[in-house]
């Protein structure tokens, strides 16, 4: 269970980073 939760957290962080990159690209 801990492994799945850790993987989900990592995926969430990656999604946030991609979202910020998209925002920066949209502003530029």
Swiss-Prot record:
One of its GO terms (biological process) is regulation of cardiac muscle contraction. It is a single-pass membrane protein. Strongly expressed in embryonic and larval somatic muscles and postembryonic heart. GO terms for cellular component: sarcoplasmic reticulum membrane; T-tubule. InterPro entries: SclA/B (IPR054083). The chain crosses the membrane at residues 7-27. It is found in: Sarcoplasmic reticulum membrane; Cell membrane, Sarcolemma, T-tubule. The keyword Cell membrane applies. Disruption phenotype: SclA and SclB double mutants show arrhythmic cardiac contractions and correspondingly, cardiac cells show irregular action potentials (APs), involving double and occasionally failed APs. Calcium transients in these mutants show higher amplitudes and steeper decay than those in wild type flies. Plays an essential role in the regulation of calcium transport at the sarcoplasmic reticulum (SR), which is secondarily required for regular muscle contraction. Interacts with SERCA. This protein is produced by a bicistronic gene which also produces the SclB protein from a non-overlapping reading frame. This is Sarcolamban A. It comes from Drosophila melanogaster (Fruit fly).
């Amino acid at each position: 269970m801990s492994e799945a939760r850790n993987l989900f957290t990592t995926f969430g962080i990656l999604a946030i980073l991609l979202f910020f990159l998209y925002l920066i690209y949209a502003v530029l």
